Amino acid sequence: MPELPEVETVRKGLEKLLNDFYIERIEVLKERSIASNGGSKSFIDNVKNSYLGNWERRGKYLIGSLLTKEKFSKGFLVVHLRMTGQFKLLEKEVLACKHTRVRFFEERGRELRFIDIRNFGQMWHVPSSRSVPEIVSGIKRLGPEPFSDDFNSHYLEEYLKKKTRSIKSALLDQRTVAGVGNIYADETLFDAGINPKTESRNLKSNELKRLCNSLIKILNISIGEGGTTFSDFRDLEGGNGNYGGQALVYRRSGKNCKKCGEKILREKICGRSTHWCPNCQK
């Protein structure tokens, strides 16, 4: 699943390439891609005849502002890519490929296409009279953004002080911190030198400081590399993310640790494959 760096890469592409994109027509090829009330008909009626304005990211959600030709608000287009969702910008209309789910056409002929092999991705229209969390309930449950002032070691110490689950499990919980998934949880814990099986409540203040610093560091590096592509992720122009080649533990089970030479382990923690070094992460 695309995590924060991949979603941020898509957000940057959408904002850069679609700042003058006027949606004249929409085709919904898969009804389940539309999650807002009223289904595809209501979605099309509310989103067409709109300019795509600024794009924001909240956790793994993309939030695009919709504007009239007079630049008044028409609400928001909210997207969650889930496992395999991706956007592709085409300079002219071409036949839809097999996994095309939603197509946005502009008056000049360009097409913004939403492709989703697994078909778990979702879209919502949020009217200007409502807030995004009112319509997209998952956003209400998100913890702080890693780059926000609200995310720090003091917050983690308070939030985790009674949590008996592993720190790996806590990082994957979007209520702890928004946008982190398996790749960056593993890489962060390695960088911070923390055993992923450690009970969250047992982490000391200095370890939580390292954890915060490592998470921000790893996410910034990955954003700079356009995210990670191991299977389906592509940016708006079809390019791969380049962080995967820099990963120190993720998908390196059985290989030598680049820091100490110990074999990288892979085991299930909280039902997820976890990669870590037993020497560097004690």
From Swiss-Prot:
Stored CDD domains: EcFpg-like_N
Active site: 2 (schiff-base intermediate with dna), 3 (proton donor), 60 (proton donor), 272 (proton donor)
Zinc-finger found in the keyword field: yes
Residues annotated as signal peptide: none
Pfam family, one: zf-FPG_IleRS
Record InterPro entries: DNA_glyclase/AP_lyase_DNA-bd, DNA_glyclase_Znf_dom_DNA_BS, Formamido-pyr_DNA_Glyclase, FPG_cat, MutM-like_N-ter, Ribosomal_uS13-like_H2TH, Znf_DNA_glyclase/AP_lyase, Znf_FPG/IleRS
Residues the record lists as binding DNA: 99, 118, 163
Protein's UniProt keywords contain Protein biosynthesis: no
Cofactor(s) named in the record: Zn(2+)
The EC number(s) this enzyme carries: 3.2.2.23, 4.2.99.18
Top-level division of the source organism's lineage: Bacteria
UniProt keyword terms in alphabetical order: DNA damage, DNA repair, DNA-binding, Glycosidase, Hydrolase, Lyase, Metal-binding, Multifunctional enzyme, Zinc, Zinc-finger
Zn finger limits (FPG-type): 248-282
Annotated catalysed reactions: Hydrolysis of DNA containing ring-opened 7-methylguanine residues, releasing 2,6-diamino-4-hydroxy-5-(N-methyl)formamidopyrimidine; 2'-deoxyribonucleotide-(2'-deoxyribose 5'-phosphate)-2'-deoxyribonucleotide-DNA = a 3'-end 2'-deoxyribonucleotide-(2,3-dehydro-2,3-deoxyribose 5'-phosphate)-DNA + a 5'-end 5'-phospho-2'-deoxyribonucleoside-DNA + H(+)
Free-text remark on how the cofactor is bound: Binds 1 zinc ion per subunit.
Entry-linked PANTHER family: FORMAMIDOPYRIMIDINE-DNA GLYCOSYLASE (PTHR22993:SF9)
Family classification: Belongs to the FPG family.
Free-text function comment from the UniProt entry: Involved in base excision repair of DNA damaged by oxidation or by mutagenic agents. Acts as a DNA glycosylase that recognizes and removes damaged bases. Has a preference for oxidized purines, such as 7,8-dihydro-8-oxoguanine (8-oxoG). Has AP (apurinic/apyrimidinic) lyase activity and introduces nicks in the DNA strand. Cleaves the DNA backbone by beta-delta elimination to generate a single-strand break at the site of the removed base with both 3'- and 5'-phosphates.
Name listed for the protein in its UniProt record: Formamidopyrimidine-DNA glycosylase
Species per Swiss-Prot/TrEMBL record: Prochlorococcus marinus (strain NATL1A)
